Amino acid sequence: MKTLFASVSENVQFVLLCLAVTAAVVLLAWGGEKLVMKKRHRLNAAHTITTVGMLAAISGVLMVIELPLFFAPPFYKLDFSELPVLICAFSLGPVAGVVCEFLKVLIHLLLKGTSTAFVGDLANFLVGCSFVLPASILYQKLLSKKGAVASLALGTGVMTVFGSLFNAWFLIPRFAAMYGLPLDAIIAMGTQVNGAITDLPTLVLLAVVPFNLLKGVLVSVLTFFLYKRVERLFFRRAKQS
């Protein structure tokens, strides 16, 4: 906890930027929710807050469990923390999904702190939202099994495109600068696992794109098969009241 507070005090401007970006994403989610959930019956506030908190806690713990990938540098690791967030967004709407995403990152910070001066944490939040937001907005409009498939496919596609561009434009160069490394040193980590990676575009194409695509597909499949079961567990009594 002390380490986290020290990191906040050392990076006040960037933390404020993170909060501003979070507020902007919440507003975007609120607009999408108003558009597709105008006359939908809503759960009471206490149950919503409790459910979002529980799913965020599960996500925060899942975020700690990371799996290395054979085709990507060691700083790209797979986790399934988006699964509870997607279930939250499908059940309660885009705003709840974004709040759950934010709390997930916050819980992870409390558990492990930050080793990236919050840059990686902001990236995780934004890339996660690029998956959850479009998927949940479309699902809330369609509300069917076919709609769920289309929504998850859309979310995976948006996350893959956004995550890849965000890595190329901001994240990889920022990490290189933060650790005082030339960009070539980051690329060399990719070359070690795949000789075809020789520059930033091939690093993104051969490591970042497959990473986001694999994560999106796996989380989507799990969400499709688990969503209704988890929804019944968390939401049945509240919806009957």
Where are the regions that the model predicts?
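Loop-helix junctions at membrane interfaces
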Residues: M1-S241
